[in-house]
């Protein structure tokens, strides 16, 4: 089996741009280059038409109206605009916000910034499977709660939260519900009407589109108001000023159009690859899948290998492009805060690999990856005195390690 290495298995960080998307974008760089806001000539009109077509394609994927789509520079900006924008606008109603400990840093750090501004934030724990306990959420809601923010799909462990149930709870209590759907679009069906979502963050590049473009869905009925965070020419109905990058928007629109059309075949492809990988690593002892395997996107596997050190594992499988933790925080040597929130100990949190498949991943590549990991785990464990002690039946938790 000859497989071209390194094998790219880090699609949750970013996939390549789909060739069909790239082809659609190119004319808007050189030929149809007008500014969509130039309304006095055909260059501007053509660009605006392309932007509105993309807006409609993005809205269609999430069952929204195209007037509810606001373009941003990416999901990080969408999260900032949604959370800060709503918190500032509804300040007179209350100053309490609720989110989850396993959210993306773009949500957690935005919440921390609001805490510095005097808001109160409750960070919910998750269960061992990574899912939010709805009773815990209900108990956290107060009279002055104005916003709840929960991600649809977790970027590290791929678990899918019960967004419709949370939407129901929030709508009943007239609380604004924000969802970070960067990892959900194109992986699971997203319907903002059925799920009663008020604000939804989206990313272009996570769906085989270009980087540097995202969108925020802002509900019109019942209407949600936001305070703008970026001021200027009043673009995007005043929500987000700045010249619209037509080529990026066209790319994101085409990516979302393809994602809607090919969701079923992508899902079948991912499930097949996942089965091949899980079969390939069968028989390795002390392997833990992080996060619920049922309520999960089909292209994500986050696996901890006990008695193997994370950094040495990444180096041992250098023929694979995988990550431990998310790309946004993998430069840090701290164990993943998401895995810690599941109750994993430092050792298991440190020995995790996030393996994420994509549209372009082949069965041969996944087979190769599983076999490589299996052989390297064996070699690394041979070098581990802890593994030897574990195999000898010694309970490592009962040992008092001497401090030096």
Swiss-Prot record:
Any one Pfam family match given in the protein's UniProt record, by short name: Aminotran_5
Catalytic site: 328
Binding site for pyridoxal 5'-phosphate: 75-76, 155, 183, 203-205, 243
UniProt pathway: Cofactor biosynthesis; iron-sulfur cluster biosynthesis
Tagged with keyword Methyltransferase: no
Annotated positions binding [2Fe-2S] cluster: 328
Modified residues (N6-(pyridoxal phosphate)lysine): 206
GO biological process, any: [2Fe-2S] cluster assembly
MF terms in GO: 2 iron, 2 sulfur cluster binding; cysteine desulfurase activity; metal ion binding; pyridoxal phosphate binding
Location relative to the cell: Cytoplasm
Cofactor(s) this protein cannot do without: pyridoxal 5'-phosphate
Keywords carried by this UniProt record: 2Fe-2S, Cytoplasm, Iron, Iron-sulfur, Metal-binding, Pyridoxal phosphate, Transferase
Highest taxon above the source species: Bacteria
Catalytic activity: (sulfur carrier)-H + L-cysteine = (sulfur carrier)-SH + L-alanine
Enzyme Commission no: 2.8.1.7
Main location: cytoplasm
Listed GO CC annotations: L-cysteine desulfurase complex
UniProt keyword Metal-binding present: yes
Entry similarity comment: Belongs to the class-V pyridoxal-phosphate-dependent aminotransferase family. NifS/IscS subfamily.
Subunit structure: Homodimer. Forms a heterotetramer with IscU, interacts with other sulfur acceptors.
Role this protein plays: Master enzyme that delivers sulfur to a number of partners involved in Fe-S cluster assembly, tRNA modification or cofactor biosynthesis. Catalyzes the removal of elemental sulfur atoms from cysteine to produce alanine. Functions as a sulfur delivery protein for Fe-S cluster synthesis onto IscU, an Fe-S scaffold assembly protein, as well as other S acceptor proteins.
Protein name as it appears in the record: Cysteine desulfurase IscS
Species this protein is from: Neisseria meningitidis serogroup B (strain ATCC BAA-335 / MC58)
């Amino acid at each position: 089996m000859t497989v071209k290495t390194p094998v790219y298995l880090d699609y949750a960080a970013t996939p390549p741009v789909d060739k069909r998307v790239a082809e659609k974008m190119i004319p808007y760089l050189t030929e149809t280059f007008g500014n969509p806001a130039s309304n006095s000539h055909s260059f501007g009109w053509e660009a605006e038409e392309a932007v509105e077509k993309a807006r409609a394609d993005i809205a269609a994927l999430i069952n929204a109206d195209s007037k509810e789509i606001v373009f941003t520079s990416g999901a990080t900006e969408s999260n900032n605009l949604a959370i800060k924008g709503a918190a500032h606008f509804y300040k007179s109603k209350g100053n309490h916000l609720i989110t989850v400990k396993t959210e993306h840093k773009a949500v957690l750090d935005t919440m921390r910034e609001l805490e510095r501004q005097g808001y109160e934030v409750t960070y919910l724990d998750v269960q061992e499977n990574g899912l939010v306990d709805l009773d815990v959420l209900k108990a956290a809601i107060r009279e002055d709660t104005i916003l709840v923010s929960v991600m649809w799909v977790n970027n590290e462990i791929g678990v899918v939260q019960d967004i419709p149930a949370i939407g129901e709870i929030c709508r009943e209590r007239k609380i604004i519900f924000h969802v970070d759907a960067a990892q959900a679009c194109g992986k699971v069906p997203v319907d903002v009407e059925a799920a009663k979502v008020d604000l939804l963050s989206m990313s272009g590049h996570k769906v085989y589109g270009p980087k540097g473009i995202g969108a925020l869905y802002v509900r019109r009925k019942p209407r949600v108001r936001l305070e703008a965070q970026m001021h200027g020419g009043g673009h995007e109905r005043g929500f987000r000023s700045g010249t619209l990058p037509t080529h990026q928007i066209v790319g994101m629109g085409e990516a979302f159009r393809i994602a809607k059309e090919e969701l079923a075949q992508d899902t079948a492809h991912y499930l097949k690859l996942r089965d091949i990988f899980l079969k390939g690593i069968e028989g390795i002892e002390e392997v833990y899948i992080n996060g619920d395997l049922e309520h999960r996107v089909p292209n994500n596997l986050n696996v901890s290998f006990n008695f193997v050190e994370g950094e040495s594992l990444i180096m041992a499988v250098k023929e694979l492009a995988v990550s431990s933790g998310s790309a946004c925080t993998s430069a840090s040597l701290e164990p993943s805060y998401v895995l810690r929130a599941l109750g994993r100990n430092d050792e298991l949190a440190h020995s995790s690999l996030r393996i994420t498949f994509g549209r372009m991943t082949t069965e041969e590549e996944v087979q190769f990856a599983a076999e490589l990991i299996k052989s390297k785990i064996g070699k690394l464990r041979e070098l581990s005195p802890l593994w030897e002690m574990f195999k000898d039946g010694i309970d490592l938790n009962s040992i008092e390690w001497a401090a030096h």
